[in-house]
């Protein structure tokens, strides 16, 4: 949420300094002093980037079922060794939850925002090179630009491909999307009075 707040509310103050938003990294009670100064734009970008680093360290790069224990990512092997248990939390049913690739894509958007001429200032050291490097890490997931479909930008016109999307799987060009649903009344059916 800090990214969207930063995008909507950052800008130059009357003294010419480039300001971001208040950085709140802990619970704030109703009786707290909300009259706090805004952080600089760069401090906000750095804070969001640190949050994304922590997310990437904890999350899998992608979710999906596995069949053997050696497919469990190394960072989770001290927690779980049974593939069936891993699949409950990190398998196909977890697709469309935030994952490491989504964190990488948000970093790419963040650095693109930070490099924008709208936010250029001596205090903001982020450049187009930072944005390009972050975007390259996202493209590495599909083995670079060559891994993208040559007709990917028109996937939405391919009814067969759309009809075959299930269990949260995505075409190569889509990182995160709403699950395809043929009925939106599941909640109502399950919770009928």
Predicted regions and their residues:
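Structured, solvent-exposed acidic/aromatic patches
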Residues: 3-193
């Amino acid at each position: 949420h800090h990214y969207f707040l930063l995008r909507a509310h950052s800008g130059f103050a009357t003294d010419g300094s480039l300001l971001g938003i208040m950085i709140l990294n802990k619970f704030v009670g109703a009786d707290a002093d909300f009259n706090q100064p805004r952080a600089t734009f760069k401090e906000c970008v750095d804070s969001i980037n640190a949050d994304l680093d922590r997310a990437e360290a904890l999350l899998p790069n992608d979710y999906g079922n596995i069949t053997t224990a050696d497919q469990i990512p190394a960072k989770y092997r001290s927690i779980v060794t049974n593939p069936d248990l891993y699949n409950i939390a990190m398998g196909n049913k977890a697709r469309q939850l935030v994952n490491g690739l989504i964190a990488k894509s948000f970093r790419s958007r963040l650095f693109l925002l930070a490099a924008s001429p709208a936010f250029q200032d001596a205090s903001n050291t982020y450049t187009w090179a930072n944005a390009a490097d972050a975007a390259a890490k996202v493209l590495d997931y599909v083995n670079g630009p060559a891994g993208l479909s040559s007709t990917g930008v028109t996937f939405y016109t391919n009814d067969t491909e759309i009809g075959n999307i299930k269990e949260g799987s995505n075409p190569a060009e889509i990182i995160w999307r709403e699950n395809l649903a043929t009925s939106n009344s599941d909640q109502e059916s399950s919770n009928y009075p």
